[in-house]
């Protein structure tokens, strides 16, 4: 994972690179990890309902000379916590849109 201000380059298992925009990041004290929500840039990522597919991964930030690393979500407890964060984010976005 290459980490820019608002973009990352994700490399899949086949070595293909995909530029993605970072939606937001957060840290979990409970799991001792950082997480990133992101989605592909410049591709038809919307489904038939006009919704964009958003991905989430744990990540280790890189330093000045090293790329960061995306990690898989490992447990159901992690997924439950991530779902809560996502639902809170979506609710806040809806409130902002209503204003």
Curated annotation (Swiss-Prot):
Name of one Pfam family that matches: DUF1292
Family matches, as InterPro entries: UPF0473
Entry's family note: Belongs to the UPF0473 family.
Protein name: UPF0473 protein GK2553
């Amino acid at each position: 994972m290459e980490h820019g201000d608002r973009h990352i380059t994700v490399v899949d298992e086949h070595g293909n690179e995909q530029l993605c925009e970072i939606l937001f990041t957060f840290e979990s004290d409970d799991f001792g990890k950082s997480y990133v929500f992101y989605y592909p840039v410049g591709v038809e990522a919307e489904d038939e309902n006009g919704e964009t597919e958003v991905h989430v991964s744990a990540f280790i930030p890189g330093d000045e000379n090293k790329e960061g690393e995306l990690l898989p979500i490992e447990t159901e407890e992690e997924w439950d916590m991530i779902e809560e964060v996502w639902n809170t984010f979506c609710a806040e976005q809806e409130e902002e849109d209503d204003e």
